From Swiss-Prot:
Domain commentary: The C-terminus is required for mitochondrial localization, while the N-terminus is necessary for mitochondrial fission.
Keyword Mitochondrion: yes
Alphabetical UniProt keywords: Membrane, Mitochondrion, Mitochondrion outer membrane, Repeat, TPR repeat, Transmembrane, Transmembrane helix
Coiled-coil ranges per UniProt: none
Superkingdom in the source lineage: Eukaryota
Sequence ranges of the TPR repeats: 71-104
GO cellular component, as recorded: mitochondrial outer membrane; peroxisomal membrane
Protein name: Mitochondrial fission 1 protein
Molecular function terms from GO: lipid binding; molecular adaptor activity
GO biological-process terms attached to the record: mitochondrial fission; peroxisome fission
Stretches of the chain found on the membrane's Cytoplasmic side: 1-123
């Protein structure tokens, strides 16, 4: 995966993430939105897929429950979905952020990464479909040829 080129893009150290997790767990059923956001942010930055999934889930909860916090969730929802390979969702959140902040360089950079991934995967899909069609044509030709010899 291409890397994001700014200081905020590297994962937290395990001890740093543990501090956020401990605060989140300490607040239990009454976890504050800021605590939940901080923990989700740390999870999104992780290289572990399960952490990223949990981060996206927590940010989605904040996005739905706290309209006043939506703007700050958008970038990390886009980033988390990008890291998980959910490029359609990543683009949707990133585009919403760019509508609100057209000059946001991080979002513009992430948008380019999303577009590059979608293009590469689209070309890969075309190549796979083309290969399958070619294989089906060869098998069909061999079956047809074998049937013609039996007559």
């Amino acid at each position: 995966m291409p890397t994001l080129n700014y200081p905020d893009s590297s994962p937290l150290k395990p001890a740093e993430l543990q501090v956020l997790r401990a605060q989140y767990e300490k607040e239990g059923d009454y976890v504050g939105i800021q605590t939940k956001f901080n923990y989700a942010w740390g999870l999104i930055k992780s290289n572990a897929r399960t952490d990223q999934q949990e981060g996206v889930r927590l940010l989605s909860e904040i996005f739905r429950a706290a309209p006043e916090r939506r703007r700050e969730c958008l970038y990390y929802l886009a980033l988390g979905n990008y890291k998980l390979g959910n490029y359609g969702e990543a683009r949707r959140y990133n585009d919403l952020l760019l509508e609100k902040e057209p000059g946001n360089l991080q979002a513009a950079s992430l948008g380019s990464l999303i577009d590059d991934k979608v293009s590469k995967e689209g070309l890969m899909g075309i190549a796979i479909v083309g290969g399958l069609a070619l294989a089906a044509g060869i098998v069909g030709g061999l079956v047809f040829k074998g049937a013609a010899k039996r007559r």
